[in-house]
């Protein structure tokens, strides 16, 4: 069987470009204003000795200074760049090339680029890293106070099951999103084609956090199965919402299999599920606390850590914007920024409920005190009244208001 001439030509060109390509060994470079760095351009898999006399034309930018043209010597060319003004991710790339005896550049320049970030201060960059790891740790640890509280009380009374169910669905979708974006080569290839020369959208710490969060939610659900839960159930409204979210994910799978959308579009749809969950998951717990007039059973430690993580996340964005003089992160992705503020807003609501509105509530299993359940003054006063008052307290039914 003979192949069409166009296909044969494409294969031949692809084979040539696969050999004669230029790469940059330093894909990410960070320098301060007034500092310099050396970037290496290298011709890989060369097939002709004439390519050793190649001149590469480089891009120019007001943020960095570099030569217009660099001469390749012995298949290598070192380029010195200096930072002029703060900028994030400025691309230095090879625009064209000329070789003795050839009128057209025969080199593949697709990978001949470097992302250069010019910062104001290295000390500020170190602070940004510290803040980043701190909020990562705070968010990662934030799941454990609730699990510990459930274990100490041997009860999940006070933990709203709607919140927990939505959290499991949200982090399940988020974990799948990160796993596919980080490990699936097909997804990464499509992303690279649609977003050429963009940094990876998902890093390993994103994958670790998402999977860890999903497992933590799953363990908490197991506690709800084995510990006392009174009459608490998942509400009908929450079940309908979860069915809707799962159905959306299932439809996305179907249209992906039918080649109506790419697998990258399917992966992005998983992030929409997480965003939808974040927007609505806090309402059930806040309303549940209001109904019970108590936060006992709902760990304030979780909220304090989540508030710390969210606040430090925004602080890191501010510090990064200052260091590179780029505030686009706040308006270029308003959804992410808005969701962060939604979480912080509800964290403040929960802290007001716990410390101001319902600090002395009497509910079942309030005998565990500490950071999660402060010792109510009313219980201390009752203990001082003697046996008569104690008998009265023992005969009084716990105060719980059900849905």
Swiss-Prot record:
Known function: Cystine/H(+) symporter that mediates export of cystine, the oxidized dimer of cysteine, from lysosomes. May play a role in the degradation of engulfed apoptotic cells.
Protein name: Cystinosin homolog
Main location: membrane
Biased composition range(s): Basic and acidic residues: 374-388
Record's catalysed reaction(s): L-cystine(out) + H(+)(out) = L-cystine(in) + H(+)(in)
InterPro entries listed in its UniProt record: LC_transporter (IPR005282), PQ-loop_rpt (IPR006603)
Gene Ontology molecular-function annotations: L-cystine transmembrane transporter activity; symporter activity
Lumenal side: 1-122, 184-206, 259-260, 316-336
TM ranges: 123-143, 163-183, 207-227, 238-258, 261-283, 295-315, 337-357
Gene3D superfamilies, per the entry: 1.20.1280.290
Locations listed in the record: Lysosome membrane; Cytoplasmic vesicle, Phagosome
Membrane topology: Multi-pass membrane protein
Regions of this protein lying in the Cytoplasmic compartment: 144-162, 228-237, 284-294, 358-403
Family: Belongs to the cystinosin family.
Assigned keywords, A-Z: Cytoplasmic vesicle, Glycoprotein, Lysosome, Membrane, Repeat, Symport, Transmembrane, Transmembrane helix, Transport
Sites where a glycan is attached: 45, 52, 78, 96
GO biological process, one term: L-cystine transport
């Amino acid at each position: 069987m003979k192949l069409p001439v166009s296909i044969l030509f494409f294969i031949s060109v692809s084979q040539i470009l696969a050999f004669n390509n230029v790469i940059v060994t330093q894909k990410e470079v960070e320098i301060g204003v007034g500092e310099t760095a050396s970037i290496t351009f290298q011709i890989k898999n060369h097939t002709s000795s004439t390519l050793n006399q190649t001149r590469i034309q480089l891009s120019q930018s007001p943020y960095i200074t570099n030569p217009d043209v660099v001469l390749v010597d012995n298949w290598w060319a070192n380029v010195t760049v200096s930072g002029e003004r703060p900028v994030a991710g400025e691309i230095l790339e090879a625009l064209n090339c000329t070789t003795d005896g050839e009128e057209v550049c025969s080199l593949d320049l697709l990978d001949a680029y470097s992302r250069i970030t010019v910062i104001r201060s290295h000390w500020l960059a170190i602070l940004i890293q510290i803040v980043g790891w701190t909020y990562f740790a705070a968010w990662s640890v934030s799941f454990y106070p609730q699990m510990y509280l459930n274990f100490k009380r041997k009860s999940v009374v006070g933990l709203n099951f709607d919140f927990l169910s939505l959290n499991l669905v949200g982090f399940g979708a988020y974990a799948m999103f990160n796993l596919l974006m980080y490990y699936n080569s097909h997804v990464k290839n499509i992303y690279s084609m649609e977003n050429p020369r963009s940094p990876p959208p998902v890093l390993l710490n994103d994958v670790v956090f998402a999977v860890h969060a999903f497992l933590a939610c799953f363990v908490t659900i197991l506690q709800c199965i084995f510990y006392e839960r009174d009459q608490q159930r998942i509400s009908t409204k929450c079940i309908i919402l979860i069915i809707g979210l799962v159905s959306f994910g299932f439809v996305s799978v179907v249209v992906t299999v039918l080649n109506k959308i790419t697998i990258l579009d399917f992966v992005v749809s998983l992030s929409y599920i997480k965003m939808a969950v974040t927007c609505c998951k806090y309402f059930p717990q806040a309303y549940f606390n209001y109904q019970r007039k108590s936060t006992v059973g709902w760990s304030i430690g979780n909220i304090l850590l989540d508030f710390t993580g969210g606040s430090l996340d925004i602080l890191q964005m501010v510090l990064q914007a200052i260091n590179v003089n780029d505030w686009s992160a706040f308006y270029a992705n308003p959804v992410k920024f808005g969701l962060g503020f939604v979480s912080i807003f509800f964290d403040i609501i929960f802290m007001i409920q716990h410390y101001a509105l319902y600090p002395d509530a009497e509910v079942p299993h309030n005998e565990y005190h500490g950071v999660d359940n402060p010792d109510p003054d009313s219980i201390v006063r009752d203990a001082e009244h003697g046996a008569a008052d104690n008998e009265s307290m023992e005969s009084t039914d716990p105060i719980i208001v059900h849905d």
